[in-house]
From Swiss-Prot:
ATP binds at residues 20-25, 77. CTPSs have evolved a hybrid strategy for distinguishing between UTP and CTP. The overlapping regions of the product feedback inhibitory and substrate sites recognize a common feature in both compounds, the triphosphate moiety. To differentiate isosteric substrate and product pyrimidine rings, an additional pocket far from the expected kinase/ligase catalytic site, specifically recognizes the cytosine and ribose portions of the product inhibitor. Keywords: ATP-binding, Glutamine amidotransferase, Ligase, Magnesium, Metal-binding, Nucleotide-binding, Pyrimidine biosynthesis. This is CTP synthase. It comes from Anaeromyxobacter sp. (strain Fw109-5). The active site is at residues 385, 511, 513. Pathway: Pyrimidine metabolism; CTP biosynthesis via de novo pathway; CTP from UDP: step 2/2. Residues 1-271 are annotated as: Amidoligase domain.
């Protein structure tokens, strides 16, 4: 519902020179600063690829697919927005070229353009402007991040649309922020501004004059160099800011505030706001950089480990768990396909094992080996989505003796389909946007670790899957000691499992990483990291006891 009585102001964030400069983090950090000044903020990500959404894209190409409460499969930057601010993202907060064109084509088929020739301008650009206004929803500030790099042909309709927006809403209601790179050339021993100058030149040729520049650099940019950038880019010298490389992403809001970015935005928007309250951000950064209880090593066993962006929310949720336990989490990425070769030595070097979500049969046997290692050696274990299914399969094979127990996803001929296709999925033909997506309730069983960690009887968690535990095997599993600690109250689907004869063995069918924040670590991640810390301390105590044995003592 659009709120009345407010006129939304728009901040458009673009990027130049190279990709992966951190526009999403910059946008999220600006959102955090403005929110801490008492303003209501939300975000919109515009992605220039033709896919309708990233749901069917390879993690190696796109990175993580972030799932919202309403079941949208979106860009991972929406995760940054939710973690850094209190804004709730929905399908309205992420649009792709494919989705924009699909909307326009559907309207054309319905005859809504009254026989006109449908063109990029005005029809595509008008649709882009319409979704921008819809995403605003009456907040104080809408931060719009335009994906890609200025100069990419795919981005042109979006850039034209945001160019028009300034004239639609007025000068004081639209600000353009451009993120560029100011590289340090070691051979010359100095920073170079030419890439930034060319990037801004390209943006101005499109018709957009940036109001402020965020200059990404691995070192402070001197005032003289900022003045030079301002001169050649036609920007006020007070609107050129260093976007400094930092050790933790949670330092970015503090770094930008130190540069005076939020003050400048308040000036450009001509909007009153209070001084920001950043104490909690300073506390978080302190815990991340100097935890009281040292470091734990968590093995993340997956098949997308070469690209850490594939597990972005999970990586951050582990950091949040570390904040809660006042410990640094060192993530050790373990390729599950290599475990299948028989060398499990990497699993002996970690304090806890996590098997995240995934799709496809490749690497699954390695994940099952990791589950067995964690179960038999009493190493804290956490299985998410596919990780729960791997735990169920391993338990069926090793404990129940169900030979060739498997998921129907991987072996349609298995004699023991302990993981099966959900009933609602059996008639589904299309791949895109058809999984069990979004938030569903999970009822927790009294006396379980899950109930203890959450502290409530009913929780709401986000899902992204087609397969589930086969309830036909439920009695067998319970008889052998597996506890089904969480179920969907409407369909009786298994949502959580655990083992009582283990220090910490928990699996969940949902994705708790999507609801974790630095100021509110998710209970399952907080509990898991705490268990890893206890495991580390117990191992240290055992090693200390061995070193203190008398010489010649037989043990």
């Amino acid at each position: 519902m659009v709120k009345r009585g407010k006129k939304t102001k728009y901040l458009f964030v673009t990027g130049g020179v190279v990709s992966s400069l951190g526009k999403g983090l910059a946008a999220a950090s600006i959102g955090a600063l403005l929110e801490n000044r008492g303003l209501e903020v939300t975000h919109l990500k515009l992605d220039p690829y033709i896919n309708v959404d990233p749901g069917t894209m390879s993690p190696f190409q796109h990175g993580e697919v972030y799932v919202t409460d309403d079941g949208a499969e979106t860009d991972l930057d929406l995760g940054h927005y939710e973690r850094f601010t209190s804004a709730k993202m929905t399908r309205k907060n992420n649009y792709t070229t494919g989705r924009i064109y699909s909307n326009v084509i559907q309207r054309e088929r319905r005859g809504e353009y009254l026989g006109k020739t449908v063109q990029v301008i005005p029809h595509i650009t008008d649709e882009i402007k319409a979704v921008i206004r819809e995403a605003a929803g009456g907040v104080d500030i809408l931060i719009v991040e335009v994906g890609g790099t200025v100069g990419d042909i795919e981005s042109l309709p979006f850039l034209e649309a945001i160019r028009q927006m300034k004239y639609d809403v007025g000068e004081e209601n639209a600000v353009y922020a451009h993120l560029t790179l100011v590289p340090f050339i070691a051979a010359a021993g100095e920073l170079k501004t030419k890439p930034t100058q060319h990037s801004v030149k390209e943006l101005r040729e499109i018709g957009i004059q940036p109001d402020l520049l965020l200059c990404r650099s691995d070192r402070e940019i001197a005032r003289e160099m900022k003045d030079k950038i301002a001169l050649f880019c036609n920007v006020d010298p007070s609107a050129v800011f260093t976007a400094l490389d930092v050790k933790s992403i949670y330092e970015v809001p503090l770094s930008l505030h130190k540069e005076g970015l939020d003050d400048k935005l308040a000036e450009l928007f001509n909007i009153w706001s209070r001084a920001p309250r950043l104490d909690k951000w300073e506390q978080i950064v302190q815990k991340v950089k100097a935890p009281k209880h040292g470091e734990v090593r968590v093995g993340v066993v997956g098949k997308y480990v070469e690209l850490h962006e594939s597990y972005k929310s999970l990586n951050e949720a582990l950091v949040h768990g570390g904040i809660g336990a006042d410990v640094r989490v060192k993530q050790v990425f373990i390729d599950s396909t290599k475990l299948e070769e028989g060398d499990l030595s990497e699993l002996n070097q970690v304090d806890a094992i996590l098997v995240p979500g995934g799709f496809g049969v490749r690497g699954t046997e390695g994940k099952i080996l990791a589950v067995r290692h964690a179960r038999e050696h009493k190493i804290p274990f956490f299985g998410i989505c596919l990780g729960l299914q791997m735990a169920v399969i391993e338990f069926g094979r090793s404990v129940l003796g169900l030979e060739r127990a498997n998921s129907l996803e991987f072996d349609e001929q298995t004699p023991h389909p302990v993981v099966t296709l959900m009933e609602a999925q059996k008639a589904v033909a299309d791949k895109g946007g058809t999984m069990r997506l979004g938030t569903y309730p999970c009822a927790l069983k009294d006396g379980t670790k899950a109930r203890e960690l959450y502290g409530v009887d009913l929780v709401q968690e986000r899902h992204r899957h087609r397969y589930e535990f086969n309830n036909a095997y439920r009695a067998q599993y319970e008889g052998a000691g597996m506890v089904f600690s969480g179920t969907n109250p409407e369909l009786n689907l298994v949502e959580m499992i655990e083992l009582n004869n283990h220090p910490h063995f928990v699996g969940c069918q949902f994705h708790p990483e999507f609801k974790s924040k630095p100021f509110a670590p998710h209970p399952l991640f907080a509990g898991f990291v705490h268990a890893a810390r206890e495991q580390r301390d117990q191992q240290a105590d055992r090693r200390a006891a061995v070193t203190k044995l008398p010489v010649g003592k037989n043990v």
